[in-house]
Amino acid sequence: MEVVAYYRISSVKQEKSQLGLEAQKSSVRAYCKAHNLVIISEHTDSAVSGSAPLESRSGLVDALASISSHGAQALLVAKVDRIARKMFVQLSIENALERMGARIISAAGEGTQEEDNPNAVFMRRIMSAV
């Protein structure tokens, strides 16, 4: 499966934490290796809040455009909260991906893989609201 990877940090201070870019990349790449996924492009937003609207996040906009133009099947993130901190923002991104025939996959496994499983969808909604 071909995927587009997306990484986000909200502050320079966060870079040195377990949510830093290198930690996210390591997690995503290990997940790809374990699940035979191929990253076709990688996109990053640095010093951007997860509550910022989509239009102010150039890395995420580029990631979605890459999925659309290359036909990737998923947007792969280290954790779901790297996509959005507000449920409405995450739902709008999920909706855009669904229209492209793609979905979100979290390397942390936060219920994002089993789209047909109501429990997984429920868990994803809970995680995006926290």
PLM feature spans:
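Short, structured surface patches at the beginning of a domain
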Residues: M1-V130
